[in-house]
Amino acid sequence: MIDEQRFLELESIVKNMVKVGIVESFNQNNATARVVFEDANLKSYDLPIMVKQTKDNKDYWVPDIDEPVICIFLPTGIESGFILGAYYNQKDKPPVIDQNKRTVKFKDGTIIEYDRKQHKLTADVKGDIDIKATGKIDINASGAMNIHSDTSINITAPKIDLN
């Protein structure tokens, strides 16, 4: 039978394995952040931020300062842990409420969205778009294609075919 002291130690470890906090600072060189846990009046060490991939394909996402995050810690304490990610709350709500849409909304108002029900990709960019390819670029549409500019359209190539 487990004695009361060991039970209390185990309970303390489990209670401190998952914590909710606010990002206080970000270390760009290491892609780590420090988190403040107001419920315990504690501050973490620099914590790695969980991402989808880091080896051959790389995914980069970092939380903003003052963003609420969920952290998980190893049983050794808040010296060793990870930021799992951010979460929506009453202050910071989702950009859309539709299970058929995958949406990324940036601070400047730029939105990139895919609607799987409508089969439509939308990019509403509040700035320039730069597309580069080391190979060819094909744009095909089974419907009409429209190109509009409020100023000018420049096409530069050794050969231009219009049919």
Q: What name fits each language-model region?
A:
Residues 32-34, 82, 122, 130, ...:
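General beta-strand recognition
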Residues 43-44, 53-54, 79, 92, ...:
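A short local loop/turn or secondary-structure capping micro-motif enriched for an aromatic residue
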Residues 45-47, 82, 94-96, 124-125, ...:
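A short, polar/proline- and glycine-enriched secondary-structure boundary/capping micro-motif
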Residues 38-40, 107-108, 126, 156-158, ...:
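Short strand-coil-strand connectors
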Residues 37-39, 87, 127, 135, ...:
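A short beta-strand motif that forms part of the nucleic acid-binding face
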Residues 73, 78, 116-118, 125-126, ...:
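Trimeric beta-solenoid/beta-helix "fiber body" segments of extracellular/virion adhesins
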Residues 1-117:
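Exposed beta-strand/loop interface patches that mediate assembly or binding
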Residues 1-5, 9, 20-22, 132-163:
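Intrinsic-disorder/coil detector with helix-boundary
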